[in-house]
């Protein structure tokens, strides 16, 4: 069981610094931007437009990274059967998408491994703003334990601490912890797995929040100026002493009677539309450029004229950023399956987590056709299994190999 004072220090520091930042990032993804909380000027129109680049950046990244799902490969048929069973029971594709979404928004994600009454391994994503990793101080820091806190329906806060052997539950009130219970979990390691988006644990749109705020202000000011233009003042000179009745008659009859040197004109603000549109285009371009994301609405990407190679070239910076996320995601998936294998092996199984290979496939248009063409060219050079594993339309290489053998057997019988 971990030291209560140390747990409180980590809990207090996280609530003071990390939790507000992560909450703000999630709010931006949901469209709750700072411009909505800006002070109001009672003398001006108050349009506050949210241009949600954050959701666009995250949804494009998650779709590109996880749109075709994750596949696994192993030379052991029993291990592949176990992976298929556990993945199906846990709706793994949904979990992986949720983790990728948290990575893109918050720069970090977490999942909890547990087992149900039938001792079937389960994994569930946790909210990043309520989970605290605690590492040792070695050259290669290892996870000592993880803290999870949440509020119950009665308003009380519960703190759960997971280490390599046990889970301890505490009540948290007025800055103090009261220990309730400790139970073993049998995973052989800390059953909370952390996922990193990059080395700095930064979200995908976090570096461009100031640009997004600037675009929101510019767009809102443009609409406010247009509204001011619609409500502009009418200046009348040479009409003599006009009273409210005269002004009412002008509005009703739409006729103004002026002296010889009289004049009527609107007082309007000159708006440089070209400058504003150029500024908006520049800021929008900087948002996509500095976030390492491609604007999918660009004319060069909107059509179907580009080949797969040309599209990949246009997506190079985007791919570089996603590749970093993939490296960290792969390590965390390896930890997930290692612990699942360790738990199942306690019941007499002999699964090898190191023998599980993770295969990521980008969600690109035209990819299946190009992959099929490449598979045909590699036929006879690589083994049939290796070729099949890299076809994005095949989720289970073993099942596909079995179907091929069955079809070949039927042909021979005929």
Question: What residue spans do the PLM features occupy?
Answer:
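Extended, charged amphipathic alpha-helical segments
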Residues: 180-310
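A short, surface-exposed helix-loop junction/capping segment
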Residues: 80-83, 264-265, 313-315
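Extended, helix-rich architectural segments
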Residues: 1-122
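Leucine-centric amphipathic alpha-helical interface motifs
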Residues: 2-18, 237-238, 403-414
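Short secondary-structure junctions and interdomain/linker hinges
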Residues: 18, 32, 64, 68, ...
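Short amphipathic alpha-helical segments
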Residues: 75, 79, 87, 91, ...
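C-terminal helix-loop subdomains that flank or include functional centers
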Residues: 282-414
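Extended, regular secondary-structure scaffolds
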Residues: 110-200
């Amino acid at each position: 069981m971990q030291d209560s004072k140390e747990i409180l220090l980590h809990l207090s520091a996280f609530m003071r610094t990390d939790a507000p930042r992560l909450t703000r990032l999630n709010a931006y993804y949901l469209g709750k931007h700072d411009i909505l909380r800006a002070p109001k000027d009672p003398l001006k129109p108050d349009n506050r437009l949210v241009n949600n680049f954050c959701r666009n950046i995250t949804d494009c990244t998650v779709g590109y990274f996880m749109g075709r799902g994750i596949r696994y490969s192993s030379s052991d048929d029993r291990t592949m059967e176990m992976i298929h069973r556990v993945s199906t029971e846990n709706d793994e594709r949904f979990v992986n998408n949720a983790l990728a979404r948290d990575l893109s928004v918050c720069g970090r994600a977490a999942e909890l491994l547990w087992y149900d009454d039938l001792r079937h391994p389960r994994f569930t994503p946790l909210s990043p703003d309520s989970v605290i990793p605690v590492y040792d101080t070695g050259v290669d820091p290892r996870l000592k334990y993880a803290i999870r806190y949440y509020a119950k329906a009665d308003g009380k806060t519960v703190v759960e601490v997971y280490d390599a052997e046990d889970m301890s539950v505490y009540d948290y009130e007025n800055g103090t912890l009261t220990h309730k219970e400790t139970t073993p979990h049998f995973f052989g390691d800390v059953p909370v797995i952390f996922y990193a988006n990059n080395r700095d644990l930064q979200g995908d749109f976090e570096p461009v929040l100031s640009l997004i705020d600037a675009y929101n202000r510019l767009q809102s000011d443009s609409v406010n100026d247009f509204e001011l233009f619609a409500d502009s003042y009418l200046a009348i000179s040479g009409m003599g002493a006009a009273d409210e009745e005269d002004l009412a008659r002008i509005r009703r009859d739409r006729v103004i009677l002026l002296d010889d040197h009289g004049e009527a004109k609107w007082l309007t603000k000159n708006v440089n539309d070209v400058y504003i549109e150029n500024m908006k285009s520049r800021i929008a371009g900087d948002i996509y450029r500095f976030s390492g994301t491609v604007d999918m609405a660009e004319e060069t990407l909107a059509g179907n004229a580009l080949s797969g190679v040309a599209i990949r070239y246009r997506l190079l910076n985007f791919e570089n950023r996603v590749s970093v996320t993939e490296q960290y995601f792969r390590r965390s998936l390896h930890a997930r399956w290692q612990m699942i294998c360790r738990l199942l092996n306690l019941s007499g199984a002999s699964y090898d987590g190191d023998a599980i290979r993770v295969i990521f496939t980008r969600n690109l248009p035209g990819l299946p056709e190009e992959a099929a063409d490449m598979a045909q060219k590699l036929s006879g050079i690589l083994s049939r299994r290796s070729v099949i594993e890299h076809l994005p339309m095949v989720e289970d290489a073993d099942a596909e190999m079995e179907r091929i053998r069955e079809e070949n057997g039927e042909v021979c019988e005929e």
